[in-house]
Amino acid sequence: MSAPLSIEQDDLLTDDLKSWLSDIDFSNDNEEAIEMEPSDIEMSSPPIDIETSPPEEADVNLDDTWATVQKNGNNKLNRFILTFFPSDMDTKWLEPETYFENSPNKFDCWTGQYEYCPDTGKLHAHIYIECNHKHRIRFNVFHREIRKYHQSVQLQLAKRASKKQRQSAINYVTADFKRAPGSLVFRWEHNKFPSDFDPKCVNKKSKSDKVSKDEQHETQRLWIESKPRHWTWDQIVHENEESKKLLFGCTAGEKYHKGRHAEDARRTINDVIIFYGAGGTGKTTEAQAWGSEDEPVQECRYYRRNPDDGAFWGGGRTCYKGQRIVHYEEFAGQEAFGRLKEVCDIGKHGPAVNVKNGGALLNHDTVIFTSNIHPAGWFHKLWESDPKQWMPFERRITQVRFYPSHRADGSLNQPDENNPPYFIDQTEEFRQFVGDYDKAKEHAELHWPLKEAPEPTAQVFVPGRSHGVTENTFFEYCKTGRAP
């Protein structure tokens, strides 16, 4: 008489068997596929899912749970892994003759071993079985015969039929590290093909070596976070061999790294500083060192606005990356006046700007100008035609330094290790202009005169043209030898 009809499953085994399925899901190419009768292929691997097992205490009637596989109960079995929980490690439970008569005609392979579940410690058997195509057994018949001897029975059908699938399944049910102590692998003497463990076919995605996607993403995120924000993505990826291996296929990492500046709070523009005067007096060096006490890494705090970039604020490695100091070097009015007022608007946040292949928000608190020209000459044509435009610029200035060509003692103003840059603070003098551009020009004439407007260039007649061509006077002198 068969045992009571209750089906119990161990937690083992859902994870264990699903792992096997994912590990051996190889493509079924023609070279490795095992030949089947066309009518058999569809029926050989019915899609039966493993479901969560009911508690052991519950006595579930078989009819209640059979509905999940009843529609496939008449399907014929082909390749599958059998799992059951025997009462002991008697070898007979691993032999097909225990369950079926005339087994050599029914099966082509029957190989397995006893194992202990690492979590629950329960004894169970894993057996890989291949049925003979001409004498395949139906699912419900096979299940019923095994249930006569064991209470908990699970069948997991293979999704593919290939040599790789076969060897992977054999490796799964004969692995040494999982075998129960004191037991041996059972290899049926009537197997139609070798059923030995093949180390060359060990699955690279074994459960012990798997790293979930979440863990991998977290490792990548922490690696990116450990690098300075001003680094480019290429610098992070190619830092060393470990970074190349970790981030080679990380397509989202570059976008994540670019967005790290969003964590910084928006800064308010507080200072607009002007360093003007003679060349070689240390203006640029002072600008680059500004704020180094708070942030020693220059790339993190300092950005030099390159007038050659035009409307763009850099790109790639030269792109603006949220630095708090913006430096206009050798400034002579190259920036549009309206845009400059936005960049220097005290008490406001920086405007949005264009960067190559994207955009950015200026997040600076300090603007520094270094120039060999007095500030009154930067937009002199605009201010001479409309003097009232000087006031919006002047009220934004918070500090002015003049770097003369000579020191107070008459020596050249050339800074070195023993002589720091010499400058004169003219902040109060600029405040006395009170928006009067004429006073600014007078101040320039007194301290650092503006250059006179260049003389008009000569008009050179070119035969075949109806109008003169503007030509540099020096170029004309070189060609003719005569003063223009």
UniProtKB/Swiss-Prot annotation:
SUPFAM superfamilies: P-loop containing nucleoside triphosphate hydrolases. Its main location: host cell. Keywords: DNA replication, Host nucleus, Viral DNA replication. A motif (Nuclear localization signal) lies at residues 146-153. One of its GO terms (cellular component) is host cell nucleus. The keyword rRNA-binding does not apply. GO terms for biological process: DNA replication; viral DNA genome replication. The keyword Nucleus does not apply. It comes from the Viruses. It is found in: Host nucleus. Signal peptide: none annotated. Plays an essential for the replication of viral DNA. Presumably cleaves viral genomic dsRNA replicative form to initiate rolling circle replication. This is Replication-associated protein. It comes from Chaetoceros protobacilladnavirus 2 (Chaetoceros sp. DNA virus 7).
